[in-house]
């Protein structure tokens, strides 16, 4: 197959003309019609026709041949391209392009500052803030396909690299300097944006993001935000409003410990379980409510705290319940222990009655399927020795 631009699809620069986006759409359509596998992947991941109706970010479980044979028109390709940039539709992308091409546009000023934030360009950011100090309170006006459609992120939210459009979720090595530049200039440290169906400050978004963790700056950013007054306790009632419980839920133990060091309270059995504090967990056990105990087992298994898992099982917690909402509720404690590579915890759960045939509710994988997909060879061998099968094997 000859070279096709879609195979090298990448986001266009900020001030790209609408014609360039149209060209991307035409290339996508042409590549789909020629059977290009990259084009099929883009359509599968971004066109609503090929996404799950209940879990709108999840591609349907369908063969590539079905997408290849689908009758698609230019409007379909344009919609998919708009969704690659996380816009709601082509009209929203077109409105954005019009905004960034007006020299006096607040959209251009804000989006240019976003580019400086995610690129780690301190000089450009300072220049933008000096010329337009209102940027410190400005909000994104993008119309996305998220819940809710307009996330209203501030520039500081972009430092967290979470809850905003995917191609802007980047963490430069000097993210701490970027954050300090914004905060020293007067950015509101706990401003709320509309993300994931709730209202969130930067801190909980930071401690649930893989990008600052992979860049090695997540803990330093926690300290920076707290230095400037960020609340370490929950603000509001959204699912992930507690920075500590959010960090634990997403597996960022170092960030969780940093929050405790900076004053976050360990005042629930779930928090104690996630942090591996056996004495505290045992002390809280008798007075903990059922949901807290349920959450505690989920977190203890996810983080590999064997003694706390045993404590909770001895107290009657059921290893076969799906985890509670906000703690990978599509999976069981065994799924999470397997995925994180906690072999001893997985073995204990199996010994205490954890079923091997329960499928997660998103990917329909059994614990063995998770082990094999995640490269947990020793755990997979153990599970197979105890009769485990993958979903495909169970359906044979």
Segments (PLM) and residue ranges:
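Ankyrin repeat domain, specifically the short helix-to-loop turn at the C-terminus of the second helix
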Residues: 129-135, 180-188, 223-231, 258-264, ...
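Ankyrin repeat A-helix N-terminal signature
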Residues: 115-120, 149-150, 158-175, 202-218, ...
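Start-of-repeat signature of ankyrin repeats
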Residues: 152, 196-199, 239-240, 293, ...
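Ankyrin repeat boundary signal
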Residues: 137-139, 191-193, 234-236, 268, ...
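N-terminal segments that cap or nucleate solenoid repeat domains
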Residues: 105-151, 155, 275-296, 308
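Ankyrin-repeat-protein effector appendages
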Residues: 101-113, 253-275, 279, 283-292, ...
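Intrinsically disordered, low-complexity eukaryotic regions enriched in glycine, serine
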Residues: 2-127, 131, 169
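Conserved ankyrin/ankyrin-like repeat signature
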Residues: 124, 178, 221, 254-255, ...
């Amino acid at each position: 197959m000859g070279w096709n631009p879609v195979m090298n699809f990448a986001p266009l620069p900020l001030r790209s003309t609408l014609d360039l986006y149209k060209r991307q759409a035409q290339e996508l359509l042409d590549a789909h019609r020629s059977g290009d596998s990259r084009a099929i992947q883009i359509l599968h991941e971004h066109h609503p026709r090929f996404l799950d109706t209940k879990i709108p970010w999840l591609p349907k479980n369908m063969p590539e041949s079905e997408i290849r044979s689908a009758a698609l028109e230019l409007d379909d390709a344009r919609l998919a391209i708009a969704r690659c940039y996380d816009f709601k539709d082509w009209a929203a992308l077109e409105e954005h392009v019009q905004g960034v091409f007006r020299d006096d546009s607040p959209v251009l000023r804000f989006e240019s500052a976003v580019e400086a934030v995610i690129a780690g360009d301190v000089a450009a950011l300072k220049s933008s803030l000096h010329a337009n100090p209102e940027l410190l309170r400005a909000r994104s006006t993008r119309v996305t396909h998220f819940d809710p459609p307009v996330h209203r992120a501030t520039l500081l939210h972009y430092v967290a690299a979470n809850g905003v459009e995917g191609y802007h979720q980047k963490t430069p090595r000097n993210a701490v300097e970027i954050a300090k530049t914004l905060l020293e200039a007067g950015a509101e440290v706990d401003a709320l944006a509309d993300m994931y169906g709730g209202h969130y400050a930067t801190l909980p978004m930071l401690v649930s993001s893989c990008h600052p963790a992979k860049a090695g700056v997540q803990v330093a950013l926690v300290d920076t935000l707290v230095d400037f007054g960020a609340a370490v306790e929950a603000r509001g009632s959204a699912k992930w409003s507690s920075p500590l419980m959010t960090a634990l839920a997403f597996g960022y133990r170092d960030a969780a410990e940093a929050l405790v060091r900076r004053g976050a309270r360990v005042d629930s059995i779930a928090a104690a379980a996630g942090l591996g504090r056996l004495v505290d967990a045992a002390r809280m056990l008798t007075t903990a409510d059922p949901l807290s105990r349920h959450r505690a087992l989920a977190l203890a298994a996810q983080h590999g705290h064997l003694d706390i898992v045993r404590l909770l099982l001895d107290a009657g917690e059921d290893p076969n319940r799906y985890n509670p909402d906000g703690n990978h509720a599509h999976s069981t404690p065994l799924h999470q222990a397997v995925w994180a590579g906690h072999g001893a915890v997985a073995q204990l759960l199996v010994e205490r009655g954890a079923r091997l045939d329960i499928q997660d509710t998103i990917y329909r994988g059994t614990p063995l399927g998770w082990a094999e997909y995640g490269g947990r060879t020793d755990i997979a061998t153990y599970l197979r020795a105890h009769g485990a099968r993958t979903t495909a094997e169970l359906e044979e």
